[in-house]
Amino acid sequence: MTNAAARDGRLLEIRDTSTPWTLRTYPTRAEWEARARFIREHILACTGLLPLPPKTPLKPRVFGRLEREGYAVEKVFFESLPGFFVCGNLYRPLNGARRTPAIACPHGHWARGRLEDSEMCSVPGRCINLARQGNVVFSWDMAGHRDSKQIGHRDFGGPREDLWGIGVLGLQLWNSIRVVDFL
């Protein structure tokens, strides 16, 4: 073993799901903010979003409002990139408040995406619950799911996309950033 390998902490202990993990603490706010900047930049670089693309107009369309007990739900689509659409549902409380907290609610890895409504999980149920608690909630399709079929969920990524330095993770992250802009 070389001296460099002997000092490599990854070679000293094999970690598994039973290994205790202590989160690093930061003695000052400035140290944490520096670390947060580093992490943010690292994520953007790894997803092909450094530098960030320009934020073009979203051109949102909100329509098809249905009112139910304590909430309303509307259909939404907007452009995260010129000609690329993010589709979803906007849940709003019916409490009449002018300003309410907003929640971006991704669907996770469920087979039916934002429309998953099973014993294990109900994405619409989660959104309805949050809206009835007074929050505006947006649940959107990941690329390749439900109404967002401009690209296939597993088909995006290859030599052409590599030339641009963006893959499906970068596209999903960019769509999520634009969801926050929409809210």
Describe every region a protein language model picked out:
Residues 2-3, 16-22, 114, 123:
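Serine/threonine-rich low-complexity intrinsically disordered regions
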Residues 10, 17, 21, 56, ...:
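A generic structural signal for ordered alpha-helices
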Residues 1-12:
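Acidic, low-complexity proline/glycine-rich segments
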Residues 97-182:
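Cap/lid segment of the alpha/beta-hydrolase catalytic domain
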Residues 12-91:
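Non-catalytic accessory segments flanking enzyme active sites
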